[in-house]
């Protein structure tokens, strides 16, 4: 039995912060001395018997409850940090019984318990580490890439592989498949990917815990076999040699040489889409296939409903299992691909057009090298990383570029009680700015000054200090100097909301004593951040995420990804817009003369965008969280900061009414992830509540001035938070609460610790006490 085997483990993993400092590895480099870098290390000598037993108990608890609470609770590093800091929760918990009132003292006790717990989780660099995974297609490409290049057992030790298999087993659905994300319904894409991953990691065709391989293979064959896998799966399995390139729609590398006046041009694409298809087109243009090993031949036999050599590959190009299909390809798309497949591609493989293909591959590789250098070989994200790395290996298996990629693989690994996975690339800055704001809201400054100072230093150290190298606009890039990334400075890709929240924290702490929070940020660096935000506003007043929006909306019809949406071009987002309003409003108060007219115009247009993007029911669609509750919290915050009130703003009244109408019987809020793909509000099954979403709704109502009209809904929500708090001061892990590209959900493990604290802090400082009895 898998769990019994794990009881014999006598060694432990450790989370290391800032690894690489003083390292003589010539292939590992950093722009700011690896501040915020997170890597896991297996220590064969670590751990007392009690510590190992605690880890094992966490694993078994997750396994027993894996179909009830789907995401892990991210406990391994928390246990480590709490042990290292000798954390003991000294404040006893207080519960609010039915018929009792909530007093200021009860709210304060709950708040202090949460603050002390969160403070203990801060890293030595000043940020809060956390899992940022969830999609179940993140890890297999790394395994495939390292298998192809011969580095699988070199980069991933036996302990790494054991924990990766644990993650796969623990997140297998009861029907034998794997969802697009943790807890999602089974899909061909992720079931095939995880089956192949298990086999590459050493499992036999009938191996795996609880017959994992046999069950998943049956699911695949029962649903049509690998020919029904979506396009990204077709691409990766062609690279691996388990599928055939002639069963893929064309991805011509000539695209990267298109003139800029064309409506279809790389500079007009969303950066993530652009940098996914860039290396894919290189691999497609070369029709690269990895070594055909006996294992690859076995996989060809195991995963199709007909003999591999008898498959008519050209007819499989447009196939996609119904379980995976969210964004069906249009007839125009199919005609375009067919014309490329039957006319253009045959020409480009023949002389003299073959020379054009060769030149295009060189141009594509030039762009790949540029992006690698600009990101210290982290690349933009985990979907792109193995593609970029493989392209470098194909160009030169012994080259420095490939070795620099290898040195950054461990930045993507994350370990929890549910095993080891690939996560995005880290959410260090994002989690830090929210943790800092929640702590600031607590008004317990005298107790947590050292925590605030370290967090402030991390935020300042993580600001991007330069634009992308060279002629970055020619490389389809936008300015980045003064921005903040989602993770750390090395990553290099600034994001508007990360920039706005980072700027807000620095501005707020510039008003506090330097003896408490450290020296304020230099004015020029603040101005650089403001410049980033001003550059990101569109004509409609909205703010985009990574690069200025403006491409024609019809380009989205060319979306080739069957299971995601809104990923071809940049859009404006209510969340990014509201964050920018918050930061620039505070900047305007503190630096009233700097670009005064531009900022006033920006704020006016941004407020108009929020008002115009409201749904008829009063909600706002959240693009990065689940979903309407998340978007509504942001929008109400932005409107309130801009000076709008419930009495003079219809949008604010409608937003508050939406939240009041969706409050659950227990006083909380709970929204299903199905709201995201369906684009309409859907409550959690059984109308149960989620504490993170409850916190967002509470803060949204507070921004609307609900406490002045009727504080009862806020008291009811606070009662739920207070009574749900754990013994150590944390809050329990529940459903995933974040999303991206409309149809995929993702885990932000720090949300459960940050947002309930923040909501209680706002509640304690702004809602009158005592509450009525209820």
From Swiss-Prot:
One GO cellular component, as annotated: lipid droplet
Location of the active site: 497 (proton donor)
Domain of life: Eukaryota
Family matches, as CDD domains: SQCY_1 (cd02892)
EC numbers, comma separated: 5.4.99.41
Catalytic function, reaction form: (S)-2,3-epoxysqualene = lupeol
Keywords, alphabetical: Isomerase, Repeat
Residue ranges of PFTB repeats: 111-156, 161-202, 209-252, 466-514, 526-568, 603-643, 652-693, 714-755
PANTHER family associated with the record: BETA-AMYRIN SYNTHASE-RELATED, TERPENE CYCLASE/MUTASE FAMILY MEMBER
Protein name, entry field: Lupeol synthase OSC3
């Amino acid at each position: 039995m898998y769990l019994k085997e794990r009881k014999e483990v006598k060694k432990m993993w450790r989370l290391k912060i800032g690894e690489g400092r003083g390292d003589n590895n010539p292939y590992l480099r950093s722009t700011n001395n690896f501040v915020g870098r997170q890597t896991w290390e297996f220590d064969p000598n670590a751990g007392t018997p009690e510590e190992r037993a605690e880890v094992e108990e966490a694993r078994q608890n997750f396994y027993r409850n894996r179909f009830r609470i789907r995401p892990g609770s991210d406990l391994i590093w928390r246990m480590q940090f709490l042990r290292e800091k000798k954390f003991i929760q000294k404040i006893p918990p207080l519960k609010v019984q039915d018929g009792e009132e909530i007093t200021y003292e009860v709210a304060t006790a709950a708040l202090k318990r949460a603050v002390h717990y969160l403070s203990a989780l801060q890293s030595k660099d000043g940020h809060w580490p956390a899992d940022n995974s969830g999609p179940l297609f993140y890890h297999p490409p790394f395994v495939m890439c390292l298998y192809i290049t011969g580095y699988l057992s070199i980069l991933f030790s036996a302990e790494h592989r054991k924990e990766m298999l644990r993650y796969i087993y623990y997140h297998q659905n009861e029907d034998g498949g794997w969802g697009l994300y943790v807890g999602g319904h089974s899909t061909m894409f992720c079931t095939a990917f995880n089956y192949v991953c298990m086999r590459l990691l050493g499992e036999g065709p009938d191996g795996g815990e609880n017959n994992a391989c046999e069950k998943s293979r049956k699911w695949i064959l029962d649903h049509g076999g690998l020919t029904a896998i979506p396009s990204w799966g077709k691409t990766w399995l062609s690279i691996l040699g388990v599928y055939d390139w002639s069963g893929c729609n064309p991805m011509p590398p000539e695209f990267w040489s298109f003139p800029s006046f064309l409506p279809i041009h790389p500079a007009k694409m969303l950066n993530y889409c652009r940098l996914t298809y860039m290396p894919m087109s290189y691999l497609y243009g070369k029709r690269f296939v990895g070594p055909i090993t006996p294992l690859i031949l076995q996989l060809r036999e195991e995963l199709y409903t007909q003999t591999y050599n008898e498959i008519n590959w050209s007819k499989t190009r447009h196939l996609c299992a119904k379980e995976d299909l969210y964004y069906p390809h249009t007839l125009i798309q199919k005609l375009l691909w067919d014309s490329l497949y039957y006319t253009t591609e045959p020409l480009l493989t023949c002389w003299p057009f073959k020379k054009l293909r060769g030149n295009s591959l060189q141009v594509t590789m030039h762009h790949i090298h540029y992006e690698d250098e600009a990101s210290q070989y982290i690349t933009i994200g985990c979907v792109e990383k193995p593609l970029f790395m493989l392209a470098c290996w194909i160009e030169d298996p012994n080259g420095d570029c490939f070795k620099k990629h290898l040195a950054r693989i461990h930045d993507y690994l994350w370990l929890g009680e549910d095993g080891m996975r690939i996560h995005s690339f880290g959410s260090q800055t994002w989690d830090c700015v929210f943790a800092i704001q929640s702590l600031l809201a607590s008004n317990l400054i005298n107790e947590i000054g050292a925590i605030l100072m370290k967090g402030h230093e991390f935020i300042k150290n993580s600001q991007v200090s330069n634009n992308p190298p060279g002629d970055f606009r020619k490389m389809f890039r936008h300015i980045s100097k003064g921005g903040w990334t989602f993770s750390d400075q090395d990553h290099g890709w600034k994001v508007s909301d990360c920039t706005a929240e980072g700027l807000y924290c620095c501005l707020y702490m510039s008003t506090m004593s330097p003896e408490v929070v450290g020296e304020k940020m230099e004015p020029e660096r603040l101005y650089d951040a403001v410049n980033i935000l001003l550059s990101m506003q569109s004509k409609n007043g909205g703010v985009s995420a990574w690069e200025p929006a403006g491409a024609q909306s019809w380009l989205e019809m060319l979306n080739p990804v069957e299971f995601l949406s809104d990923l071809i071009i940049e859009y404006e987002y209510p969340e990014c817009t509201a964050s920018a309003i918050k930061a620039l409003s505070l900047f305007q108060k503190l630096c009233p003369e700097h670009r005064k007219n531009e900022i006033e115009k920006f704020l006016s247009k941004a407020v108009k965008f929020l008002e115009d993007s409201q749904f008829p029911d009063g909600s706002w669609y959240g693009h990065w969280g689940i979903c309407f509750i998340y978007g509504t919290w942001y929008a109400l915050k932005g409107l309130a900061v801009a000076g709008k009130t419930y009495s003079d703003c219809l949008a604010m009244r409608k937003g508050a009414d939406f939240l009041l109408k969706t409050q659950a019987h227990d006083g909380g809020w709970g929204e299903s992830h199905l709201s995201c793909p369906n684009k309409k509000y859907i409550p959690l099954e059984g109308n149960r509540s989620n504490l993170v979403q409850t916190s967002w709704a509470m803060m949204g109502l507070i921004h609307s001035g609900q406490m002045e009209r009727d504080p009862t809904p806020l008291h009811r929500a606070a009662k739920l938070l207070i009574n749900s708090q754990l013994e150590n001061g944390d809050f329990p892990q529940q459903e995933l609460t974040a999303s991206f590209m409309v149809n995929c959900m993702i885990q932000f493990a720090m949300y459960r610790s940050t947002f309930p604290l923040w909501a209680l802090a706002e509640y304690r400082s702004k809602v009158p006490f005592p509450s009525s009895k209820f």
